[in-house]
Amino acid sequence: MNSKTADAIAIAYVVLYAAVIFFFPFDYSPVAEKTVKALFNSGEVVTNTFHWAGINFSKCFTDLEGLKHFGNVVSGFPYLTGFLKVALLATFGEMLKNRRRTGSWKTSDLLPKFIVWGLYGMLFSLVFALFAKGVEAISGTALWFGPRPFVYATASFWEKVLMGFSISFWTNLIFCYPMMMSHEWFNAVIKQRRFVGGSELLASLDSKIWGSFMLKTIVIFWIPAHTITFSLPPDFRVLMSAVLSLALGFILTVKPKAN
């Protein structure tokens, strides 16, 4: 396959992924012939089910119906959707980096890297929820400044930005660098096909990348990017998280230039 064809397929892949999210035809919500109000009045238990919701193109644009469906499914199945989102896009980001560096989309050990990215996606689903709820809980107390209680629907623009920054700051300060380092360890294990000890890993790291570049990405890119993400309405966060998954795969495959 020539490079132009591969590039066209890659572009189509990104467009298709975005379209699936924006026009997501499935939902995870109460479904019955009765309305939710009727179910409530009848005393029946209202439960969420995964079901086909169809595609209403006008509502997808005016009411973001597809994004809301996708958000409901993400909320209902956080680990499964976390695995798929990050595995699909971070792996693609890694392939994109390889395309830029070598001129080819071919990436070695693609399947194990896909699985590792997926496992990180599951971890992200848990960690981001922990930090978001944790920061909201201490906001406005002696532990941390900010609005209390924080209710997104009634919060002002600057309260949302402040909360987004607070969540982003603590997430990246505590979690980001160890996560990137652990991913580098997985890469070393996959590449060498054996267990890699801590001292061996540290000795192999490029000081310019891990002592400077990665730290700068946290301050210059990740904290601002996650501030925007956590400041957005929930329906838009799924799109932003998809873009950041792509960026993550791109950034974490940076290699030192040959002398």
Predicted regions and their residues:
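Transmembrane alpha-helix/helix-exit interface in multi-pass inner-membrane proteins
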Residues: 121-142, 165-193
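Alpha-helical transmembrane segments of multi-pass membrane proteins
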Residues: 10-37, 59
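Membrane-interface interhelical connector segments
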Residues: 134-162, 196-197
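Hydrophobic/aromatic-rich structural module bridging two neighboring secondary-structure elements via a short loop
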Residues: 99-128
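Alpha-helical transmembrane segments
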Residues: 74-84, 159-177
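Hydrophobic, membrane-inserted alpha-helices
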Residues: 220-229
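Membrane-helix boundary/juxtamembrane motif in polytopic membrane proteins
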Residues: 191-216
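Loop-to-helix transition at the N-terminal end of transmembrane alpha-helices
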Residues: 40, 70-88, 110
